[in-house]
Amino acid sequence: MEKHMGMSRRQFAVGAGMTALAGAAVVASSASTAWAEKAPTIDEVNWDVVCDVLVVGFGGAGATAAIEAADAGANVLLVDKAPEYLEGGNTRYCEQVILGWEDEQVGYDFVTAMADGHEDVTEEIRRMIASETVKNGDWVAAHGGEFADSPIKLDEETFKKVFTNIDERIKSNWVGQMSDGTWTFFEYCTWPNTDRLNDYQVSHYYGVVAPKHHKGYWEFLRKTVESYNDKIACWFNSPATKLIRDRETGIVLGAVVDHAGTPTNVLARNGVVLASASYEADANKRQTYTGREGTKFVGSTFDTGDGIDMVAEVGAQLWHMNCLSGPFVNPPKPGSDQAWWCGGGLNRATDTGNSIFVTANGKRFMRECGMNHHGFMPVGDTYMNMQLPKKFFAVMDADGFATSQFHGKPTYVVVGMDNISQADTIEELAEKLGVNPEGLVQTVADYNTYCDQGFDADFARYPESLAKIENGPFYGIEYTGAFVNSQGGAKRDVNCQVLGWDGEPIAHLYEAGELGSFWGGVYIAGGNIGETMYSGRIAGANAAAAKDDAVEEPAGAAAPANEITVFDADAIVASYECGENEHVGVALGIHAPIVVKVTLDGETVTAVEVLSQMESPDVVLDLFTDMPERMVEAGSADVDLQTGATIASRGLQDAVKDAMARAGVVIEG
């Protein structure tokens, strides 16, 4: 055996290995204590405000944590970086479906399949998710809400924009057939094994009962927090910027909160809960953690992963940084880091098949049919995030355009979209898009041949989804990959305690929701919303629990003032003056209350004036001028809602009906 400086090759290798292990231990040790170099002790901080529990992030998880902590007797400060009525994170904007199951063991098997081999999603974690999820309904009911199983039944008319026919639905693995012959819509209906779960729905979509076109779960949480105004103080426009960890005790004492522009040291005697969402709205973090350039996001603009930066500074481990929902196939908003949310998980741009996706070389790169699973598609038997170019184009003919979301009266997905091009020929369209003309002409010709043959020789697109691109004019629309929610953050245990690099909990620091989500592996619809409840409950209760090392209240620190606006329709109405036959009404939209003044001639609407609203301009467009005009023309509030802005439309309609009801007009429906 060859010798090196008196050592055999084997001795050298073993010695090098031991040195590497020792080096790794030193690195881990250094990482777990480096935070202390610049950290203060409790006596070195001038505390401005004191509470029992500080919750950072007023979304689904933060609201739940605050409520649970208050139920345990804690005085809670709940802070959010957004202005009031823009708080809520993705919980405010999502579809409000809540993943759940009826049987704990079945839930465990399902979560195990979804974890898909992620070792850090341990059996203990999977058992916790399975058991805590079944408690969500009781928690909602205990706080005055109504929780219901909401199976999404399919029919050809309702879901014609999702699938061309039942064969495509089955092939996309999104549906199971019930014994009564109906099809039920739920994601991953073949897991935890490969058999289609006909008449046996493992995962259910629940929801908080609310009127149609309302954000039931979010409205329930916001209303509940409002009702706790003697226990939960809320601050808006107040991002937490830094955690304060005592260098001697290792306890997280509180945080620096930029309260309306003023750095404020907040002492949390019992614990801090971070529920400030993950990073999908931060372009740099998306590129860093996904390795993808040019992606966009859909959802709250405030979800920029601030908590990730804060936990890293106090020695926390990170996990699930590359776990995201997406990319979805969406058009980008011009001049924005966001994408338009249109098509949901559809892998094509039109309701019919008269379209393809191409890149700058004019060539196709994917099978444009069916649906992805929150951006995941099977590669063999493994579900993985789709690989999409950073920029590509939907190419369609007039027939396809007529069935797309870009046709007819403009909906919100069209506004400002100077990246929609129209041409009389494919060659001309290619020039306008900046796509290789020869490549695109050949691609369209090949695709049309496949349609005639009933077989896609390039990507095996479902035959029932094939329809030719042949009737001009022709259209091209820019697309990109867009992420909806991410799961990265601090690693946590089943008690929602944040773990340091040494694997031990960081004292008094907890985490809930998408920030450091338990979801590793494959994501499923409603998974994060269900998690807001069970992780919020656990984090809030544990943060509020009595502790032997609870921090003493310092002299001079004040209790936080509550800045939330409690919704009081009568008070809002009373704050406006009315003339003869004028009546004020109010109702909820997605954001602040929508307030209107309605003029009546008997029971006939003759004028509608919108007095106050905070809906997103690029979503509602001309809603607040167009819809009132249509109401006056009809003499009634019962007019069609605006496509693409149904919740704001419903809020406006409800506000007008409220004004009419206050005038004594009997409103039906």
Predicted regions and their residues:
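N-terminal secretory signal peptides and thylakoid transit peptides that target proteins
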Residues: 2-20
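Beta1/beta-strand and adjacent pyrophosphate-binding region of the FAD-binding site
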Residues: 45-59
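Conserved redox-cofactor binding core of oxidoreductases
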Residues: 131-262, 283-284, 331, 451-471
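A glycine-rich dinucleotide-binding beta-alpha-beta segment and adjacent secondary-structure elements
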Residues: 242, 439-519, 610-613
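Active-site- and interface-proximal helix/loop "cap" or "latch" segments in soluble metabolic
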Residues: 566-669
